[in-house]
A protein has these predicted regions:
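N-terminal leader/targeting and accessory segments in enzymes
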Residues: 1-63, 67, 212, 235-239, ...
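Short, well-ordered alpha-helix to beta-strand connector turns
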Residues: 12, 37, 48-49, 102, ...
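Acidic, Mg2+-coordinating active-site environments of NTP-dependent enzymes
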Residues: 33, 42-49, 142, 166-313, ...
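Short internal beta-strands
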Residues: 38-44, 205-209, 342-343, 366-374
Length: 450
């Protein structure tokens, strides 16, 4: 059996050495042989067992898996979503809508692997090839018809979706993130664009034309469908934002549709349109899709609302400058009282976005409490220094302990105020140093206000 984890090798297995971001499988070849590997596939070296040298083991693995499981792959429709923000909500809405329409659909992404309303936690937004194919086989056994995936820039850069072909791809937006991995914004853009070169000949490419980089994803070789407030295939004519819903008029060809989304936020209009267009691209009538609209909801940690007296507490995953700006602008459109924000930045990650997020939070909030997100192995004081280094306002304080920060934020609420707790969303853990402990923002809020 072909395996990429030396620890799982048993007698007679073939070990394939993959180079990752942190580790290189070539460093574990000897261990794999000791564990019983009878064959090694790698890019370099000489070993005491049968050895196949190939130019790129990741390319080899992708072709091997595609050839081996062609029957299973051909039974699915694949939908891939990429972008800085909105991937999870867009993909999760597609998962819900298609299942409500009677098309058995699985979801793979940030919040896990969903099939038959069961959830399995994942380590990465887009798993590696071996794990991905395990999920595909599980989907095949369960008669899944459509697989909707979040496709991250990491996955595209590292070849985790090599040789897959998509029936529908969608671009949500592009803003600063992951520069610690890609090195430059241009590299980040190039990584995202790779998904749009993986569309089947009869596939559909869905593009947010309002995004400043939208035109970079309009490839002539694709059948492009655009959406946005600007003139587009699916055009938003007007909208009205409320704390618990969003109303807007949608123009498609010569038809107009008045839509009431049971989820708030201007950005969720965009996320919903990705889901709507994906369903239509698979052959559903737009009016049939809209009939299911009352049945959808956002995933955990995406604008999770907790009512507290006359106030509203919102837990959200917003952890990039653009996501933070979008959620703050949205709540400012319907706030009646003050807006308080609790936010931090992850450690051992892109430092350049920290002062930007600090500026956005203090500009659009009445008051901000900066706190720990997942500091990991980075000094928490360094993270805070980066966040506040350019601030000349005094409408903020720093409370490193996240639970104490949430307690303080709740204590500030008076009447019809809004408290945003940003950055972690669905996560039920906090990483400090190398220790991962249970921590769930929503649980903490409910415990405090009970």
């Amino acid at each position: 059996m072909l395996k990429t984890d030396s620890r799982k090798i048993t007698k007679g297995d073939t070990f394939l050495a993959l180079k990752g971001v942190v580790t290189d499988g070539h460093d574990y070849i000897e261990q794999a042989i000791l564990n019983g590997a009878s064959k090694v596939i790698c890019e370099r070296g000489s070993y005491d067992v049968e050895t196949l040298i190939v130019p790129d083991t990741r390319v080899y693995l992708a072709k091997y898996l595609k050839d081996t499981y062609k029957k299973q792959l051909d039974s699915f429709k694949f939908i891939g979503i990429t972008g800085t923000n909105g991937k999870t909500t867009s993909a999760y809405l597609i998962y819900q809508l298609l299942n409500k329409l009677g098309k058995k659909t699985a979801y793979i992404g940030t919040i896990g692997f969903y099939v038959d309303d069961t959830r399995r936690e994942l380590n990465n937004t887009t798993p590696d090839l071996m794990d991905l194919y395990d999920m595909f086989l599980d989907c095949y056994d369960k008669n899944v018809e459509v697989i909707v995936m979040e496709v991250s820039s990491h996955a595209l850069e590292l070849g985790r979706v090599l040789d897959l072909e998509f029936d529908v791809v969608a671009f949500t937006n592009l803003t600063q993130d992951h520069l610690d991995v890609h090195g430059s914004f241009e590299n980040y853009l190039n990584a995202k664009q790779k998904l749009f070169k993986m569309v089947k000949n009869d596939g559909v490419a869905i593009v947010n034309i309002d995004d400043s980089y939208g035109d970079k994803f309009l490839f002539e070789s694709n059948f492009n469908v655009t959406y946005g407030i600007k003139p587009a295939t699916y055009q938003i004519l007007d909208y009205d934002l409320k704390i618990n819903k969003t109303k807007f008029t949608l123009k498609v060809s010569n038809n107009s549709y008045d839509i009431t989304l049971p989820i708030p936020g201007k950005y969720n209009m965009y996320n919903f349109l990705v889901a709507l267009i994906s369903a239509v691209s698979l052959g559903y009538d737009i009016e049939d899709v809209l009939k299911k609209i009352d049945l959808i909801k956002t995933p955990k940690g995406r604008f999770d609302i907790i009512n507290y007296n006359s106030n509203v507490i919102v837990v959200d995953y917003a952890h990039t400058p653009d996501a933070v700006l979008n959620i703050l602008k949205s709540v400012l459109e319907y706030r009646e009282g003050k807006v308080y924000t609790i936010i931090g930045c992850g450690g051992d990650r892109d430092r350049t976005k920290r002062p930007i997020m600090g500026d956005i939070a203090t500009t659009y909030s009445n008051y901000v409490i900066f706190t720990n997100d997942n500091p990991r192995c980075e000094d928490e004081k360094q993270i805070m220094d980066d966040i506040v280094c350019n601030l000349d306002r005094n409408n903020y304080e720093i409370i490193y302990d996240r639970k104490l920060a949430i307690e303080k934020g709740i204590s500030l609420l008076k009447e019809k105020d809004i408290l945003l707790i940003l950055g972690k969303g669905h996560e039920d853990y906090q990483i400090i140093g190398k220790e991962k402990t249970h921590f769930d923002d929503k649980e903490v809020v409910l415990e405090i206000i009970k």
